[in-house]
Amino acid sequence: MAADKIDTIVSLSKRRGFVFPCSEIYGGQKAAWDYGPLGVELKENIKRQWWRYMVTSREDVVGIDSSVILATEVWVASGHVATFSDPLTECTSCHKRYRADHLEEAYEAKHNRSPENGLADINCPNCGNKGQFTEPKQFSGLLSTHLGPTQDSGSVAYLRPETAQGIFTNFAQVQQTSRRKPPFGIAQMGKSFRNEITPGNFIFRTREFEQMEMEFFVKPGEDEKWQEFWMQERWNWYTGLGLREENMRWYDHPAEKLSHYSKRTADIEYRFQFGGNEWGELEGVANRTDYDLSAHAKASGQDLSYFDQEAGERWTPYVIEPAAGVGRAMLAFLLDAYVEDEAPNAKGKMEKRTVLRLDPRLSPVKVAVLPLSRNPELSPKAKGLATALRQHWNIEFDDAGAIGRRYRRQDEIGTPFCVTVDFDTLDDNAVTVRERDSMKQERVSLDQIEGYLAARLIGC
């Protein structure tokens, strides 16, 4: 993977309407992004596939949608108010601020060893001066706000840094109303917020982001088995949607870097190839033990244990948590799908072609309907076909420009099929279907086109 591929994806994303800089007419908001028409579709397709795989295709997982702003007591009990912080350091030469642990991790990735003298051995990524960092101080990752007409200590509230706590506080109600018993899971997708010191790398690290999380409640003693199970399931989900295994790996957090609630955390890392860092976290699968349920039970005075009727005993479930970010998944799928090859133009000359070889289930547009020209007979027929196909899939109608250029536009946004309505259509009532990756073309009767596409767009 080329080192400048991220820049290529950023350019493509803006040019084709996947992702735009936030508030760009005012100069932009740092590390904040808006998702355009194609980006919204890609995001929704990723979320839809996650929900199908993790929830609706299983009998042991149910869903929930909890509030973004929870009671302040939730974050006190969970340990976030006391411990959700990062080590902040500043370069005394250029006054750029960094997370100290990120500087050390980048050093380790480059030199295959830890800096012997800590920050004193590290050059500033901005100005290049060595060892000019201040002593790290803890910086809270919580974003706070005030509720109500007054702004005092009693009105402080927090925007959730994770969706998980809304699941834990609803555990007993969901378990009872859904009539589930461990092992079972509760899943949630939604926005979370973290006051990142050094956001960046496009949509990889932002202060506002969307999560896909599931908390799987199991009997203590069975947690390690279930963590291995969900690690394999999450790996399979990514590879099943097209990520290549050579661009993925597992990273087990060392004991000294585990979160305050974790017994073990393993990350799926992807070869993002950011400047200085080849690998980046794609998704984490954590064993949170009974930390959260026990903490909330103690703080609230409510019983969050489970009575096992078969065993005749009561216990507090352990929790296995696969937690993914929609933005990071989207970036990985875009990077993995991006290909440059060659294809003949109208004159038979080979030209460079850019293709997003996205799995059709993720492709923002499933089918493009293209009349050969803006002919008064062809256009109405093509528009009628597009209207009929929209009952099933997201369809794009395009009649502007040469047909070869329109094919290239669709290749670049990942559309798996182009359907061309030409002058022969008026006689034989058939259309030409072009497949994105192979560029092979096939003639299909109009009365069979829906079935033809449906057989190739299963799961879309």
From Swiss-Prot:
<feature type="binding site">
    <location>
        <begin position="194"/>
        <end position="196"/>
    </location>
    <ligand>
        <name>ATP</name>
    </ligand>
</feature>
<dbReference type="InterPro" id="IPR006195">
    <property type="entry name" value="aa-tRNA-synth_II"/>
</dbReference>
<dbReference type="InterPro" id="IPR002314">
    <property type="entry name" value="aa-tRNA-synt_IIb"/>
</dbReference>
<comment type="subunit">
    <text>Homodimer.</text>
</comment>
<dbReference type="InterPro" id="IPR022961">
    <property type="entry name" value="Gly_tRNA_ligase_bac"/>
</dbReference>
<protein>
    <recommendedName>
        <fullName>Glycine--tRNA ligase</fullName>
        <ecNumber>6.1.1.14</ecNumber>
    </recommendedName>
</protein>
<feature type="binding site">
    <location>
        <position position="99"/>
    </location>
    <ligand>
        <name>substrate</name>
    </ligand>
</feature>
<dbReference type="GO" id="GO:0005737">
    <property type="term" value="C:cytoplasm"/>
</dbReference>
<keyword id="KW-0963">Cytoplasm</keyword>
<feature type="binding site">
    <location>
        <begin position="281"/>
        <end position="282"/>
    </location>
    <ligand>
        <name>ATP</name>
    </ligand>
</feature>
<dbReference type="Pfam" id="PF03129">
    <property type="entry name" value="HGTP_anticodon"/>
</dbReference>
<dbReference type="InterPro" id="IPR027031">
    <property type="entry name" value="Gly-tRNA_synthase/POLG2"/>
</dbReference>
<dbReference type="InterPro" id="IPR045864">
    <property type="entry name" value="aa-tRNA-synth_II/BPL/LPL"/>
</dbReference>
<comment type="function">
    <text>Catalyzes the attachment of glycine to tRNA(Gly).</text>
</comment>
<dbReference type="Pfam" id="PF00587">
    <property type="entry name" value="tRNA-synt_2b"/>
</dbReference>
<dbReference type="GO" id="GO:0006426">
    <property type="term" value="P:glycyl-tRNA aminoacylation"/>
</dbReference>
<keyword id="KW-0547">Nucleotide-binding</keyword>
<keyword id="KW-0648">Protein biosynthesis</keyword>
<dbReference type="InterPro" id="IPR033731">
    <property type="entry name" value="GlyRS-like_core"/>
</dbReference>
<dbReference type="GO" id="GO:0046983">
    <property type="term" value="F:protein dimerization activity"/>
</dbReference>
<feature type="binding site">
    <location>
        <position position="162"/>
    </location>
    <ligand>
        <name>substrate</name>
    </ligand>
</feature>
<keyword id="KW-0436">Ligase</keyword>
<keyword id="KW-0030">Aminoacyl-tRNA synthetase</keyword>
<dbReference type="GO" id="GO:0005524">
    <property type="term" value="F:ATP binding"/>
</dbReference>
<feature type="binding site">
    <location>
        <begin position="204"/>
        <end position="209"/>
    </location>
    <ligand>
        <name>ATP</name>
    </ligand>
</feature>
<feature type="binding site">
    <location>
        <begin position="325"/>
        <end position="328"/>
    </location>
    <ligand>
        <name>ATP</name>
    </ligand>
</feature>
<keyword id="KW-0067">ATP-binding</keyword>
<dbReference type="InterPro" id="IPR036621">
    <property type="entry name" value="Anticodon-bd_dom_sf"/>
</dbReference>
<feature type="binding site">
    <location>
        <begin position="321"/>
        <end position="325"/>
    </location>
    <ligand>
        <name>substrate</name>
    </ligand>
</feature>
<comment type="similarity">
    <text>Belongs to the class-II aminoacyl-tRNA synthetase family.</text>
</comment>
<feature type="binding site">
    <location>
        <begin position="209"/>
        <end position="213"/>
    </location>
    <ligand>
        <name>substrate</name>
    </ligand>
</feature>
<dbReference type="GO" id="GO:0004820">
    <property type="term" value="F:glycine-tRNA ligase activity"/>
</dbReference>
<dbReference type="InterPro" id="IPR002315">
    <property type="entry name" value="tRNA-synt_gly"/>
</dbReference>
<dbReference type="InterPro" id="IPR004154">
    <property type="entry name" value="Anticodon-bd"/>
</dbReference>
